Every structure is written in C-alpha cells, then in structure tokens.
Amino acid sequence: LLTVHIPGRGEQILQTAFPEAMVDLDQHQDHFSSVSGIKAYSSIAIGPGLGQHPDSVKALEQLLQVVEKPLVIDADALNLIAANKDLLKRIPPRSILTPHPKEFDRIAGESTNSYERLKKAQAFATDHQLCVVLKGAYTAICTATGNVYFNNCGNPGMATAGSGDVLTGIILALLAQGLELSLIHI
C-alpha cells in the first residue's frame, strides 16, 4: 500500500488523482510539519513537494532521528539538507540521494565542471555510505563502495519538471518490494 503524508490542503487533490493512495494528513494545512507513525512504513521517500518552510526543517530533522532504514531523498529535502549541513550526518546509511547537478552542488560545494562533480559525488557516496544518483544527460550512480555506473539511455523529454519525482517513486517502489539495494543502483 502507498501512504502519502501531506498537508491538509492537498487531501482532496490527492484523493481525486490517486484514490488508491492512503493519506496521512499533516497537522498543518499548508506545509510538512510533523512526523508520526513513521516506523510502520517499509520504505520512505521525502522531498518532492516538501517545500522549505522552517517547520519542514524541524520535521525532517525528526524523521532523520527516528528512521534507521534507507531513505530516498530528493528535491526540497536535498535543499533543506544543503541549508542545514548538520543533517547530513543523520541520514541513514545506504540511503539514496537523487540530486540534479545544482542540488548536488548545494550540498557538496560548487564544481567547476562535470568531471569534478562526478569525483565529488563518488567521494560523497563513499564518505557518507550512501548512493548518489546524479541526474543528468548521463545519469551517474555512485555507490557507497565507490563504484560508479552510468545510465546513458535518457532523452530530452526527461528534462522536464516532475520526471525526477517519478524516478524517486520508482526507486521507492523497488525498495518497498525488498529489492536488494545493489540491484536498485543498476
């Protein structure tokens, strides 16, 4: 089952578009501000549609304090982590980060070129025991063991708003099915 934690204002829209999704309403109407019952879920993704409200930073911090299983982290969750670097050390090992180049630069520091960014992503994944899926024309998948895989089968149609959110959902679905993380990377 899919459960989506959303602010109250989004319930009608979500239920209309995806009636099969279970809804866990946030205590706030307009933004993510709380974490409840999080340990009940087999896999968790955070970021798409999250926003950057100060309450969301606190809620993300709460999430990172209680969750021990790997997370899929994307979009505004990456931006919140970039703005609050102390959250980096709280990300559970084997989590999967899915930044585009600018999001990654916000977390790891500006890169002068793609090669430097790739080397940083590889070191970052190893140092933090994470997987970094660095999205782009040739998506690079950097694993915690230092391996780097490339996916060159993208197309210009994927360079549009929302396609990264779809990738996050696909990775989350694979985690929820219990697929071994090393297979998800490829």
Which stretches of residues belong to each language-model region?
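Small-residue (G/A/S/T)-rich helix-start motifs and N-terminal tracts that mark the onset
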Residues: 1-75, 79-96, 101-184
